[in-house]
Regions:
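Accessory beta-strand-rich segments of carbohydrate-active enzymes
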Residues: 4, 11-17, 59, 63, ...
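Accessory carbohydrate-binding/adhesion or oligomerization-edge regions at the termini
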Residues: 1-104, 187, 194-205, 209-218, ...
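Active-site-adjacent substrate/metal-binding segments within catalytic domains
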Residues: 97-129, 134-142, 147-155, 160-163, ...
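Terminal connector regions
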Residues: 334-335, 342, 346-354, 771-807, ...
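Extended acidic/polar, glycine-enriched regions
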Residues: 175-183, 272-369
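Active-site neighborhood of glycoside hydrolase catalytic domains
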Residues: 442, 459-546, 696
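Intrinsically disordered, low-complexity Pro/Gly/Ser/Thr-rich segments with frequent PxxP/GP/PP motifs
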Residues: 305-325, 742-777, 841-866
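Substrate-binding clefts and catalytic carboxylate motifs of secreted carbohydrate-active enzymes
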Residues: 11-20, 86, 223, 234-237, ...
Length: 891
């Protein structure tokens, strides 16, 4: 076997959409053309343009494009040659690198680049083919991702057409090749032109930016058309790997290792192989050898002699692995990974499979019925119940093809640092590259993985669409089957819920469009290729209606309104979070501003002020601000008194408080099983739902959620007659803990002190009640223990109290390697004490913390030599609080 990578330098040219693949010769003739002034297309005359547009056009045009974006947002290709492009990559990235367009996320540049979708894009690459390659049985062109509408021309001959960014292209092109120099031409369009003649079956709800319906016909990331949290950014390009593969003989083309059961220290596993033989009209004997290695040592070797036929063949073997090292989610144990290798020898020809990292672990989804008629919804790994803590993953960039591998590792590592155990792969995004799933397996992050359909009804009445849906489901379930991080496949995002709840007649379609995909094609593919991974037809799902709180995973957006069961208004009555009946919340969220460095980056030199249209363009629109401002005003301070810097600070704190509130509420419920925020990361810089922004900077809310998700956690809630204390231990270690509880005033006086000694089992939660005084106007209940953060009973109603003025100060700064250890202290209760350096991207092990009277707290500042400054974001009591007579001490 030989492989020829086609990654690297290509040539790129834009043409009008009506320049089809059949006209490739006239496009290629421009390869070495001399510069010629750009001309208007035939349907436009110069006098048709405004005076401003005429003046702009009559300037010396760009040698590659004449771009008129101020009004018409059109681009007219010139007759001058091609520009360089690096593949893999996106057309827009090449245009940025060649100075033709600006970075779309600065200022309001997304508005200027919409013309990119209106052109066809021609990519050209020459390559050499050897005689040895052509002597092989099969010579394939493999392209992992084509976005989107692709015509592939090899040496002037049309070789293939492809319309699915979610399914790799792989075709034998041997018949088109010859020894020596060959040429590959790929004509791409973004897919937009395919929308207009289609009959739409879809309605999209609540998006300010998205195309309302016909996006559903393009099997590419749906968010690129815009959503309620991102601008539309046209995408078009070649993603991930592109190569020519020449081979004869037999090779493993798919494999996995299933963990069937655990028996003490041993594990029963089953190897599965799909083997391709290149000669279609003969059989041949094959020696299949496969091994499992752990930490460099071989722990199992298997061998099979197979008689292969042409095309695909299958093999399995069930074995017992002695003293198996199990894979666990983050915080529950080690992420032990085995190296899985295999090779085939046929007629003396050896082909080795690319090694894979696999984990030995069992996984199940428990949906058993409870006595009250409701149902569980929790995951068990290796027989242990897992509380799924995490967030919704969206693509890392609107130009998703340009995301470097390092960004994936950073985001997964940051999730693990925040004690995440799960990402939900949102269905409006994409199936990520292999490195992402490798990092999730390495860091112990489970995946609730949507198939890539979202918030729309999909045209399953079209046979060509069903064909693509089936290919995609088969390809992705097979590709991802061996990763231990895969916890559940879900059919789509919110489509079942939309059918039952969103659309009244006559808007509601006459049937559930998409059911052939979500209820038949996808579950069959999962069962064939990954049978031990559960499948759920949609997210949310279960119950008579898809989003029933007492049945399965819920998307908790209904709690933004006055919910019929909890009877509370989101963000204003926080104690009612404890009454949410959900078992598993796989979406809920609140907005929070970014750090100032991020805002200044996309403002790109313009002034940071509320009325700056660039700021509004990046998510600061009125509907979002009304929610943020209302929450700040209710819980922290009067938002009208805040300048831009204060708004960034208090907005971030508010988001963190609300995320922590629901996280703690879900974790202390006996039936609580999961809490996934909407969203974890972002595809562009905006004021939004995330705790990590587009530039991979931690937002303020990151630290609040990290504390709420701690593997060892105390939670205390005021209740009738005192307080209820929850002790959570997700670690595999058992220990004895002395839990110190009581009442404390804001100035440090204590009362009703008690100590409860608990034997804390691994992977457990315990609760107990304490009787304490109930004057919560001047103080709070607390619980503390060695190895735990102190918990107090104050919710987010900070404006209901008059706190004493803080005297917080830095007591000590020590160097610890590349880090600083900073010890801070205050003599009074001090919420929201935080360290800051001149670089707001610096990482801390904790920040925006509560200081308890006279208790020092040491914070680690990572990779920092600059001594930070201590600040306090003091809450301001409301006018009603000020009027109340709370000035006398309870004592």
């Amino acid at each position: 076997m030989s492989k020829l990578s086609l990654a690297g330098a290509w040539k790129l040219r834009g043409e009008f959409m009506d320049v089809t693949a059949e006209r490739y010769n006239e496009v290629l003739r421009k390869m070495d053309a001399a510069p010629v002034r750009a001309t208007l297309p035939a349907f436009l005359k110069l006098e048709d343009l405004s005076e401003e547009e005429q003046a702009e056009f009559l300037k010396d045009p760009n040698p590659h494009f004449h771009v008129m974006t101020d009004k018409s947002n059109h681009a007219f290709p010139s007759k001058y040659g091609f520009i360089p492009m690096t593949v893999p990559g996106d057309v827009t990235t090449a245009l940025i690198e060649n100075g033709i367009v600006e970075e779309p996320f600065l200022k309001e540049n997304t508005k200027k680049n919409q013309w990119i979708k209106d052109l066809s894009w021609w990519l050209v690459r020459d390559f050499d083919v050897t005689e040895e390659m052509l002597n092989e049985d099969i010579v394939r062109l493999n392209i992992e991702m084509l976005d989107f509408n692709a015509d592939i021309i090899v040496n002037g001959m049309p070789a293939a057409h492809h319309e699915n960014a979610f399914c790799a292209f792989s075709e034998d092109i041997k018949r088109f090749l010859h020894v020596g120099k060959n040429q590959l031409v790929i004509r791409l369009t973004s897919g937009m032109e395919l929308h207009y003649p289609r009959d739409a079956v879809s309605f999209y709800c609540a998006s300010e930016n998205a195309i309302c319906d016909q996006r559903v016909y393009t099997r590419k990331p749906q968010f690129t058309y815009g959503w309620d949290w991102c601008q539309p950014v046209p995408t078009c390009g070649i993603g991930r790997s592109i190569e020519i593969e020449a081979f004869s003989g037999a090779q493993v083309i798919a494999s996995r290792v299933d963990t069937l059961k655990l028996d003490g220290d041993d594990a029963e596993v089953e190897f599965h192989f799909e083997i391709e033989k290149s000669d279609m009209v003969s059989s041949a004997e094959c020696e299949l050898t496969y091994t499992l290695e752990f930490e460099g040592k071989t722990v199992y070797t298997g061998k099979k002699t197979l008689m292969l036929v042409g095309g695909v063949n299958f093999a399995e073997e069930r074995v017992t692995i002695k003293n198996a090292k199990l894979w666990w989610p983050n915080g529950y144990g080690a992420q032990n990974l085995y190296t899985f290798k295999a090779c085939c020898v046929t007629k003396g020809i050896l082909h080795e499979m690319q090694p894979k990292k696999i984990g030995i672990r069992t996984l199940e989804l428990d949906t058993s019925k409870l006595e009250d008629g409701s149902r569980n919804f929790f995951f068990k790994v290796n027989g242990v119940r897992i509380f799924c803590k995490g967030g919704n993953w969206v693509p890392t960039d609107s130009l998703y093809l340009r995301t470097p591998k390092e960004s994936y590792e950073t985001l997964v590592r940051e999730g693990a640092a925040a004690h995440f155990t799960m990402f939900r792969m949102w269905g409006g995004g994409t199936y990520e590259p292999d490195c992402f799933y490798e990092y999730c397996s390495e860091y112990g992050i489970l995946l609730m993985h949507d198939f890539m359909y979202a918030c729309a009804f999909y045209p399953d009445h079209k046979n060509d669409f069903l064909f693509e849906a089936e290919r995609e489901a088969e390809y992705q379930t097979k590709r991802l089957a061996h990763y231990p991080c895969m916890a559940i496949w879900t059919g789509n995002n919110e489509i079942a819920e939309s059918y039952t709840d969103w659309f009244p007649a006559p808007i509601k379609p006459e049937r559930f469009y998409g059911e052939k995909i979500f209820n038949y094609i996808q579950p069959r593919a999962v069962h064939r290729n990954s049978p031990l991974v559960p499948y759920m037809p949609s997210s949310p799902y279960f119950g008579d209606r898809a989003n029933e709180s007492e049945q399965g995973g819920v998307h908790a957006w209904s709690f933004f309104g006055r919910h019929p069961k909890t009877k509370f208004k989101f963000v204003y009555e926080l104690e009612a979070f404890d009454r949410i009946p959900a078992r598993f919340s796989s979406e809920y969220g609140f907005f929070g501003a970014q750090m100032e460095s991020t805002v200044r980056r996309y403002l790109d030199g313009t002034e940071m002020r509320f009325d700056n249209p660039i700021w509004k363009h990046h998510g600061e629109f009125d509907r979002k601000r009304s929610n943020i401002d209302g929450a700040i005003d209710r819980h922290l301070t009067e938002f009208k008194t805040l300048d831009e810097h204060g708004y960034l600070l208090y907005s971030g704190i508010m988001q963190g408080l609300l995320y922590a509130e629901l996280a703690e509420a879900m974790r202390r419920k006996p039936y609580g099983a999961g809490d996934l925020i909407w969203m974890y990361n972002d595809c562009w810089p905006e004021t939004g739902w995330t705790i990590i922004d587009y530039y991979l900077t931690r937002k303020i809310s990151f630290y609040f959620l990290k504390r709420a998700f701690a593997t060892k956690k105390l939670i205390i809630r005021a209740c009738e007659g005192g307080a209820e204390v929850t002790v959570i231990n997700e670690t595999p270690e058992a220990y004895t803990a002395d839990i110190h509880c009581g009442y404390m005033t804001f100035t440090g006086e204590t009362d009703s002190l008690c100590t409860k000694t608990l034997k804390v089992a691994p992977h457990s939660m315990q609760q107990f009640h304490i009787s304490v005084c109930n004057d919560l106007k001047h103080g709070f209940f607390f619980a503390s223990a060695e190895g735990f953060d102190t918990a107090d009973s104050l919710r987010a109603y900070y404006r209901d109290y008059v706190f004493p003025e803080s005297d917080a100060k830095i007591e000590k700064v020590e160097q610890d390697g590349n880090d600083l250890l900073v010890t801070i202290r205050a003599s009074v209760y001090t919420p929201f004490a935080y360290l800051m350096t001149s670089d707001d991207r610096v990482h801390y092990d904790d920040n925006y913390v509560t200081l308890y009277p006279n208790e020092p707290k040491t914070l680690r500042v990572e990779n920092c030599t600059e001594t930070p400054v201590l600040h306090v974001a003091a809450p301001a009591p409301s006018e009603e609080t000020k009027k109340a007579s709370y000035t006398d001490s309870w004592f």
